[in-house]
Amino acid sequence: MSKHAASSAKRFSLLALGLMFVGGIVFVWAVDFGIKTTNTLEFCTSCHTMQTNFEEYKESLHYKNTSGVQATCADCHVPKELGPKLVTKIVAAKDVYHEVMGTIDTPEKFEARRWYLANLVWKRLEASDSRECRSCHDYADMDLSEQSRSARSRHSAAQDKGQTCIECHKGVAHHEPTEPDDAS
């Protein structure tokens, strides 16, 4: 191989490496931008079928409370850790698909599937030991002496049994759907 050919190959390799590096940075930035954008309350409520959920959420303590801390859609529905977060984002793409395809594009169609959809969320939360709930609420951080007798008793028993939050707190931010007659 001539000196010129070797020099050209080296320049090409460095250019290719540089482009891959820049491409990697752009890719990571785009993924980060996409995650941050789709984690906003504005994005989550941009589909008109989510307006019912949004109105219910606005009635909950997760939206307005004495502490002034507001939990948004992503706080409850999107894991903080990168791996589970990416999986959740990929799985959530099906919701956009169903909105676009017309499966849940009206409040009536959404309500017809609400029990099924709620159960998907509940099963995911149970499987993760209510990971998203525990990012704000954790037995270890609870001051049981400040809770009502009933809450203190229930939280203490739930902790002893190793229960997860969602086992008792379904319908905490959205109305709990009623089980349809034909659900199994």
From Swiss-Prot:
UniProt protein name: Putative tetraheme cytochrome-c type
Coiled-coil residue spans: none
Gene Ontology CC annotations of this record: plasma membrane
Amino-acid positions noted as binding heme 4 in the UniProt annotation, renumbered to this chain: C165, C168, H169
Binding site for heme 1: C44, C47, M50, D95
Keyword tRNA-binding among record annotations: no
Intervals, Periplasmic compartment: 36-184
Stretches of the chain found on the membrane's Cytoplasmic side: 1-14
Membrane-related topology note: Single-pass membrane protein
Membrane spanning stretches: 15-35
Binding residue positions for substrate: K89, D95
Binding-site positions, heme 2: C73, C76, H77, H174
Entry's family note: Belongs to the NapC/NirT/NrfH family.
Keywords: Cell inner membrane, Cell membrane, Electron transport, Heme, Iron, Membrane, Metal-binding, Transmembrane, Transmembrane helix, Transport
Amino acids binding heme 3: C133, C136, H137
Entry keyword annotation includes Transport: yes
